[in-house]
């Protein structure tokens, strides 16, 4: 039986304190046919550095600052993540939250 591919989309903005636990909760899922996509919304803390540490296990993208207006809205960030996702099923996760290992 083929398992559907699941894409977990995470938007991040200045959640340095939580992003490790968030990503690890996705990597530790019992379900293994998944991809994890983290889009950083131009964070000003060390979030992106932490995200990059997982670059061999996740897909990440950093949104460029638009003019001097600061970060873009969360919908735009999730749209970017959705565009590069390849899963048949999409799960959304905020970067200050986590999944239990049997979520997927």
Where are these regions (language model features)?
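Nucleotide-sugar donor-binding/catalytic module of glycosyltransferases
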Residues: 1-104
